[in-house]
Amino acid sequence: MNHSAFRNSQDTFLSDALAGLIANHPDARWHDVGFIGRTTPLRTADGDPAVAVISGGGSGHEPMHAGFVGQGMLTAACPGLLFTSPNAVQVSEATQWADQGRGVVHVVKNYTGDVMNFTVARNAAEAVDTRTVLVADDIATDGNEDGPGRRGTG
C-alpha cells in the first residue's frame, strides 16, 4: 500500500499547519507560549466581556483544535505535539490571557494527558474562575475486538 502525505516536512508539519491556518484566519494569532487566540476581544451581544472558552489536544488532526478558534466558538486553542496533550504551561498561559474577568471554560476530552494537564493549568491559574466541561463520548474504537478498546471515555 502506498502511503502519501500532504505536508512539507514531518519536522515542520505542525508549525506549517498553524501558519497556514493563521494566514487564512485574520482573527487568529499565534502566541509563542503555545496557543492560538482570537485577536478581537470576546464580547456578549450587549457588548460586555464574555466568558472565554479554551480547548486543546494532540496535533496530527489539523485543523483540530485551532480550527475552532473564532466568533461564537473557542477563544483560544492549545495544540500539543503530535498525538500528545498540550502541556499545563500552554493551557495556563492561554487561560490567563483569555480571561476578561468573566471566567474561562475549559473543554477537555476525557483523555488522561488532557485531563491531567488542564487540571494542573486550572490550579496554576488560580486567580481565574475556571470551569471544566469533560467530553467523554468517543466511540471511534467501539466494537473493534482487535484494537485497544475505547479511549477517552469515562
Residue map of PLM features:
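Gly-rich Lys/Arg/Thr-decorated short loops/hinges at beta-loop-alpha junctions or inter-strand turns
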Residues: M1-N2, A17, D48-G56, H65-C78, ...
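Structural motif
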Residues: A50-V53, L81, R102-H106, D129-T132
